[in-house]
Amino acid sequence: MNLEIRTERLTNSVMSMCETLCSQHEICIQMLERRDYQTVYKVMKKEQRISRMVEMINHQVMELMPLVQPVPATLRRLLVSSHVSFELLHMRGSARAAAEFADSCEDEELRIYVEELERSLILTLRVVIGMY
């Protein structure tokens, strides 16, 4: 398959993962606002899907890396994809922590603070998506 097409698919996978994680954080915000209650189980399911996507993306990056040395733009996209998948793997746990916290927290001020953190993560992911 053409290298550009494979790199484009990889980029789309990373962007899709960012969108999935944004959705996960939005669920946590809804929980924190007590508007649309979602169970921690649903957040954990999303975590598992993100983990599988990270593994797939990292596998594709490793497979494509030796082929793209002469093409700086393609190499840059692969490196960004690899970095993003690494960061997202670490970020995904925060949504679960927020969901568990929302289940038990009675302190309104603290809940608002966590909600702001979740919004900040979504903003960061939107910026990452824009980098492509």
Language model features: what each stretch is:
Residues 1-132:
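Cytosolic, long alpha-helical scaffolding segments
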